[in-house]
Amino acid sequence: MTGEQNEVGTDIIMDIIDTFTNDKKGISLVNGCAGTGKMVVAISIINSLMNTLDIEEDSVGEFDDDIDKQKIAALKELKDYILKERNGKPFKIGFVLPMPGFRRTISNVFKECGNGLVKDMVIGPCDVVKEDYDILFVDESHRLSKRKNLTGYGSFDSTSRKLGLDPNETNQLEWVLNCAKHVVLFYDQYQAVKSSDLTASEYQDTLNKYSVNLNHHELKTQMRCKGGAPYIEYIKAIMNCTNTAFKTIENYDFLLFDDPNKLIEEIRKKMINIRYVKQWLVFHGIGKQSQVKSLKII
């Protein structure tokens, strides 16, 4: 965890404390573009919450970093609340992932991790009505859907009606907000790409409907791309046609193809790079996927 991620995580824990100690509903909205570590923050907070009762009374003094001290102090406060107000009953937590493929992956990660993380925590949007949740985390909340161009209208309609909502008027974000006392949303409006995804205005309108206590947070540091935030902003400017001036960025190539086959060929050439060796071998007919599973990246 970076200092920024740790700070946002600690602030969200404080949001949760405020929600429960003041017996109100609360929302934490975390904005961050791709590669800023939203998933890392989500899992870290969930892990901390699941192990809150194991926090020792004198553990604050073990840390030199102020953020770590604040986080432990917040968790101790939360522990006191759980012991006194909930008779030691842990929070019921759900981790909503809208995308089925990614949901299966994270479910397996939780299964292998243990330490309070269990695969049943990882759920889809339709599952929020199946349990009484205290806290719901939603990764990629920009992928929450409305009733448009779906593969399963039946499950959408059924879930909506269970909550007393009109299927034609509601959306999956509204489901989530109805099903927990505190909701933590990780959001990037630029990653809403399907016609079924909520638009930025639809998302905001839904929040306005429920956000009596809305806390804003932001992850700014780009962790996935060497070019960092300036590179991301430059690409956004190009895609939005707000910056037409050519800019040379060190260690990056800009290639324009008029033949998709040449684009694919160039990508395959690059796949010899680290972590893509398996795919490169398969693409070039050197072996089947099953034959290169044991290949080690050096």
Predicted feature locations:
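Signature of the SF2 helicase/ATPase Hel1-core->accessory helical subdomain module
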Residues: 135-216
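Hydrophobic positions on the alpha1 helix immediately C-terminal to the Walker A/P-loop
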Residues: 41, 45
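Post-Walker A helix-loop "phosphate-sensing" segment adjacent to the P-loop in P-loop NTPases
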Residues: 48-59, 89
